[in-house]
Amino acid sequence: MYFSRDDLLQKETETLAPYAISNANNGGRIYEEEEHSYRLPFQRDRDRILHSSAFKRLQYKTQVFIFSVGENYRNRMTHTLEVAGLSRTIASALGLNSLLSESIALAHDLGHTPFGHAGQEILSGLMKDYGGFEHNKQSLRIVTSIEKKYPNFPGLNLCRETLKGLMKHGADYDSSVILLERKENGPSLEGMIADLSDEIAYTNHDIEDGWEMGYLHLGDLLENPFWKEVYEECKDQYKEVGEKILIRTSIRTLTNFLVSDLIQNIAHRLEKKQIKSTEDLALLWKQDFRIASFSKEVDLKFRELKSFLYEKLYRHEDLIRMSDYGKKIIESLFDYFLKHPEKIPDTYKERIEEESLYRVISDYVAGMTDRYAEKIYQSLP
């Protein structure tokens, strides 16, 4: 049996909720293309992101534990895949377009620098007088212009709805990207879900990786009421298991708890506000009402857990020292290429006349992996 694009579109209309973004209403692409015979628009977006050079490099970019060696610790790619999985689950449970949520999730970290948030912090400072640097905006730059894989257009030419999902509220974006509608009507519910899935994923895997690496201990974790509540519940249920299995079980339970609360609370709000269309969602956005959120009780617990991790994990002296080293590498590379622009690869150098030297260096350095940046740094004269 063969399902054509039209068959798939018809099947989609039978399963999506009325407030979901359908493939038939994807907003189009900036550069017109012929539709694929058996792939839907958001499927093509997902595949283009997965096959992009920027996505491949995510496996060699770290988030929190810079320069850590170990096969079991997360990197940007494993984090992204976890976010995509959560996004699919939540979107499907709510009758939303899981392909769109997945595509947004897969692209959300493409613009991250090497060396995690330390890299963004130093690059943002270096670029503050030259247009700035912010990883969400950089993700948009990658998929709209920096990636070079197609003969008829720059970037990946993703659907506008996918691009809108990469825009963060309050950020200043270039209007030439033709995405002003996002500022007025807000993100899709699929995009909001990808954002919240990101929060769930990084919080839980930072707990696991921090514990695995010895930066967090059970005694530390039990200081947080939310963790203690989940851990004690698992301990009562699994009395015969050891501490390691119990901690891993608690992390899974915490993830499931947050996902379930989010799904139930969004469903409750959709029903309470009688949401019947994407227009209804846009109206609520203009009224500053966020339909996608945890319940008040869980939201408070989750915020406290994230604050706890900031104090107990992210400010650990070892992590700060590694972050400082990452910043030193990026600052040194930036300064070197400013003084020696001839050393910039030709694929970047040819854009200097169209954009500033600062922007080209920023794009080049931001696209490096951790180990490539360190390798270039160590080879500097």
From Swiss-Prot:
Record key words, sorted: Hydrolase
Any GO BP annotation: dGTP catabolic process
GO MF term set: dGTPase activity
Family: Belongs to the dGTPase family. Type 2 subfamily.
Record carries keyword Glycosyltransferase: no
Classification via Gene3D superfamilies: Hypothetical protein af1432
Highest taxon of the lineage: Bacteria
InterPro entries: dGTPase, Diverse_Catalytic_Enzymes, dNTPase_2, HD/PDEase_dom, HD_domain, PHydrolase_assoc_dom
Domain HD span(s) in chain numbering: 76-203
Pfam families tied to this protein: HD, HD_assoc
Stated name of the protein: Deoxyguanosinetriphosphate triphosphohydrolase-like protein
Keyword Zinc: no
